[in-house]
Amino acid sequence: FMLFVFYPLLLRVFGVKIGYRKFFRGLSPAQFLAFSTSSSAATLPVTIECVNNNLKVPEKATDFVLPIGATVNMDGTSLYQAVAVIFLAQYHDVDLSMMQQLGIVATATLASIGAAAVPSAGLIMLMIVLDSVGLNPMWIALVLPVDRINVTSDAAVSAIIAKSEKMMD
């Protein structure tokens, strides 16, 4: 949902004129690299190249926004952690109270902000989130194979910043 609906919609709301297909086609090399390396930081040079050359976002915007996004913008990590913890609780027939669910959201959000932009840092943070609500941290073994992506939001924000600063149409 976030990848294919929210970010393209966000671009439209802020008036960025990059078509849906052009956005994903232009960003696909960075997305594939992000998926294979599992690291926003490792993907940064390719993301910058894709956003500058394929999406035509000025370098001034991408050189400022993308490095910050690679280290701070961990929305994928936050969503992944919250969904993974709730999935693991349901898988193990653990009923979570509303307070526990709110605690999961709060802890996942804070943990994602503090997560390093290195491969699989989110898994370590996931153990902390699981432990914070009294669940077994070793349950991460079930979700280990599906850990990944934040690059798309970094590119979308870069285009929005360039548009708001009147650097692009």
Tell me what each language-model feature is.
Residues 29-38, 69-75, 89-91, 106-118:
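Transmembrane alpha-helix interface/packing and boundary motifs in multi-pass membrane proteins
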Residues 2-6, 73-76, 80, 111, ...:
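Alpha-helical transmembrane segments of multipass membrane proteins
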Residues 82-169:
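Transmembrane alpha-helical segments and their short flanking loops
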Residues 3, 19-22, 57-60, 78, ...:
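Short hydrophobic/aromatic-rich motifs at helix boundaries and adjacent loops
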Residues 35-50, 57-60, 76-82, 115-122, ...:
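Membrane-helix boundary/coupling elements in multi-pass transport proteins
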Residues 1-73:
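Membrane-embedded translocation segments of transport machinery
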Residues 22, 26, 31-34, 43, ...:
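Residue-level preference for alpha-helix termini and adjacent loops
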Residues 4, 8, 13, 70, ...:
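Generic detector of bulky aromatic hydrophobic side chains
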